[in-house]
Amino acid sequence: MFDSPWRMWRRHWDIRHQPRLFLETLGVLFLAMALPYAIINHLMNAVGWSAFDPVTRIDEQIPFIGWSFIVYLSLYLYYPAAAWFGRKNDVIVREMFAFHQTLFILTWMILIIFIVLPTEIHIRDHIPLEVRSGEGFWGYWYGDFMHKTDNPWNAWPSLHVVQSLLIVLILRRWQVISGYKAVSYTHLTLPTIA
């Protein structure tokens, strides 16, 4: 299971020199990670039981900053980055498959934790009511888009931190980012803790 690419990659291997490898890899990412996450997120929201509250005093002291949504969205640029830069040559394509297998397994393990120990985020109350109601520019992004798409569940452990850190590490391995850029990208994972 861990020492060679899974069978599902055979089709991808056959098209490894074609541009569509990128899009097909994104499709696998959606089916293997995004879709299960969304289903579990909405299921836990419907159940409505939280095992514990992961919020700390520090979390409660951080004020709402509307533009931080842009930082949050930057996480979603990481996912296609590994699929995009993992097409350079046959060795890197194999590494990309192994990387995504690792990412899938870790994600699935965390999704099991989300089911067994669901955690609700209670800090949304810090967001002004008009923003939560969908009013204004930030209201659209928070109230209408994010909060209806991603319910305040699945807070612990943080998939954002695990996934973004792994992606940065594989990009470093492939020397997509190095030196000061590597430090910058690694620091970009810090805001995903929020």
Protein language model features and the residues they cover:
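Membrane-interface loops
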Residues: I40-D53, D90-A182
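Hydrophobic alpha-helical transmembrane segments
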Residues: F85, R172-R173, L188
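Conserved small/polar residues in nucleotide/adenosyl-binding loops
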Residues: T186-T192
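Internal transmembrane alpha-helix with an interfacial aromatic "cap," most often the third helix
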Residues: Y76-R94
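N-terminal transmembrane-helix/juxtamembrane module of multi-pass inner/ER membrane proteins
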Residues: M1-A81
